[in-house]
From Swiss-Prot:
Domain called BPL/LPL catalytic: residue spans: 32-207
Binding site for substrate: R71, G72, G73, Q74, V75, T76, Y77, H78, S138, L139, G140, G151, L152, A153
Reactions performed catalytically: octanoyl-[ACP] + L-lysyl-[protein] = N(6)-octanoyl-L-lysyl-[protein] + holo-[ACP] + H(+)
Pathway: Protein modification; protein lipoylation via endogenous pathway; protein N(6)-(lipoyl)lysine from octanoyl-[acyl-carrier-protein]: step 1/2
Identification of the protein by name: Octanoyltransferase
Listed transmembrane segments: none
Gene Ontology biological process: protein modification process
Keywords: Acyltransferase, Cytoplasm, Transferase
Site positions (Lowers pKa of active site Cys): K135
PROSITE patterns named among the record's database cross-references: BPL_LPL_CATALYTIC (PS51733), LIPB (PS01313)
Job of this protein: Catalyzes the transfer of endogenously produced octanoic acid from octanoyl-acyl-carrier-protein onto the lipoyl domains of lipoate-dependent enzymes. Lipoyl-ACP can also act as a substrate although octanoyl-ACP is likely to be the physiological substrate.
């Protein structure tokens, strides 16, 4: 089925705001014939404050900008070496509920890390993916007219120190992890294809077309 096809865009390293704007425009203007898309991107350093975000969780932003986002959740950090995957899916067409999509994204990351020999798990009380007690992947979504946008952010080989300037996802003292702590050779270039392969498998292996911007 043609509409089952997914366009995959590799966007490289980009500022947060133009990508967020493009994601909103895509979602606002799509119709029933619009193909779903997955965007793979890294962002320049930025704190994003989710819809539920409270100012007290931003401790010392310093020179890193703080941008309001309409995704679910609290404050998080994006920076180079973190693989962000935005999922622009027509949930009605794919017969997915919101909770099912959250579970699917978490399982995508768990499966990707398992391939690398890293045992990870989701938590019922705090969305995302964890290795032991440390958070390695953040997750935040928005649904509009039955279509999802925003997505997940997987820490690959980034500098984790900016997370100390916030209470990540609203949890004071939440420790963060990255793949390179276990696999020093990990980069977004070699993790992104695994992440994509795993999410497509969980979406029942639709046809896809890879587009590099």
């Amino acid at each position: 089925m043609y509409q089952d096809k997914i366009l995959v865009r590799q966007l490289g390293l980009q500022p947060y705001e133009p990508i967020s704007l493009a994601m909103h425009e895509f979602t606002d203007t799509r119709d029933e014939s619009t193909l779903d898309e997955i965007w793979l991107v890294e962002h320049y350093p930025v704190f994003t404050q989710g819809q539920a975000g409270k100012a007290e969780h931003i401790l010392m932003p310093g020179d890193i900008p703080v941008i309001q986002s309409d995704r679910g959740g609290q404050v998080t950090y994006h920076g180079p070496g973190q693989q962000v995957m935005y999922v622009l899916l027509n949930l009605k067409r794919r017969k997915l509920g919101v909770r099912e999509l959250v579970t699917l994204l978490e399982q995508t990351v768990v499966n990707t890390l398992a391939e690398l020999g890293i045992e990870a798990h989701p938590r019922a009380d705090a969305p995302g993916v964890y290795v032991g007690e440390k958070k390695i992947c953040s997750l935040g979504l928005r649904i509009r007219r039955g279509c999802s946008f925003h997505g997940l952010a997987l820490n690959v080989n980034m500098d984790l120190s900016p997370f100390l300037r916030i209470n990540p996802c609203g949890y004071a003292g939440m420790e963060m992890a990255k793949i390179s702590q276990w696999k020093p050779e990990a980069t977004t270039n070699n993790i992104a294809p695994r992440l994509l392969e795993n999410i497509l498998a969980l979406l029942n292996n639709p046809d896809f077309e890879y587009i590099t911007a």
